[in-house]
UniProtKB/Swiss-Prot annotation:
It comes from Mus musculus. GO terms for cellular component: axon; cytosol; nucleoplasm; nucleus; perikaryon. The gene is Atoh7. Disruption phenotype: Mice are viable and fertile but display multiple optic abnormalities resulting in blindness. Normal hindbrain morphology, however mice show disruption of brainstem auditory signaling and binaural processing. Loss of retinal circadian rhythm photoentrainment, and decreased expression of Opn5. Loss of the retinohypothalamic tract connecting the retina to the suprachiasmatic nuclei. Loss of axon bundles, optic nerves and chiasmata, with a decreased thickness of the retinal inner plexiform layer and inner nuclear layer. It is found in: Nucleus; Perikaryon; Cell projection, Axon. One of its GO terms (molecular function) is transcription cis-regulatory region binding. This is Transcription factor Atoh7. Pfam families: HLH. SMART domains: HLH. Forms a heterodimer with TCF3 isoform E47; interaction may be required for DNA-binding in certain situations. Residues 41-93 form the bHLH domain. Expressed in retinal ganglion cells. Expressed in the cerebellum, trapezoid body, ventral nucleus of the lateral lamniscus and in areas of the auditory hindbrain such as the cochlear nucleus, lateral superior olive and medial nucleus of the trapezoid body. Expressed in the modiolar nerve root and in the cochlear in a small group of bushy neurons within the acoustic nerve. Expressed weakly in the sensory epithelia of the saccule and utricle.
Length: 149
């Protein structure tokens, strides 16, 4: 922040004044007690906001750790490991949903047989999309993540 204060007294290094005295005197006379208190209050408020933000983030990670399977680990997962496990868990659940969807469609086709409106001719089978359900739904290609040990 630039100050609009003008220096008081002789410039630093002038006759009779020590070289560093001017800067210290100018800082006190320019800032004044009101400005210093205001800056300190703003800094305290910013620190409190950052503390609340970090507490909220840590609470969110704790909640995520409770729902993500840890597969036998006794130690608390790091934030990075928690995100990796959450991603793996979401991908696994997406695959389960895709398999369930395929099974359900297959059963419905077998039950309806010839009467199925989506089959072009009797005895035809539904084309199963090789792309996993999650990729169709969310449009992303999952990448394998190395697990930290």
């Amino acid at each position: 922040m630039k100050s609009a204060c003008k220096p008081h007294g002789p410039p630093a290094g002038a006759r009779g004044a020590p070289p560093c005295a001017g800067a210290a005197e100018r800082a006190v006379s320019c800032a004044g007690p009101g400005r210093l208190e205001s800056a300190a209050r703003r800094r305290l408020a910013a620190n409190a906001r950052e503390r609340r933000r970090m507490q909220g983030l840590n609470t969110a990670f704790d909640r995520l750790r409770r729902v993500v399977p840890q597969w036998g680990q006794d130690k608390k997962l790091s934030k990075y490991e928690t995100l990796q496990m959450a991603l793996s868990y979401i991908i696994a659940l997406t695959r389960i949903l895709a398999e369930a969807e395929r099974d359900w469609v297959g059963l419905r086709c077998e039950q309806r047989g010839r009467d199925h409106p989506y089959l072009p001719f009797p005895g035809a089978r539904l084309q199963v999309d090789p792309e996993p359900y999650g990729q169709r739904l969310f449009g992303f290609q999952p990448e394998p993540f190395p697990m930290a040990s």
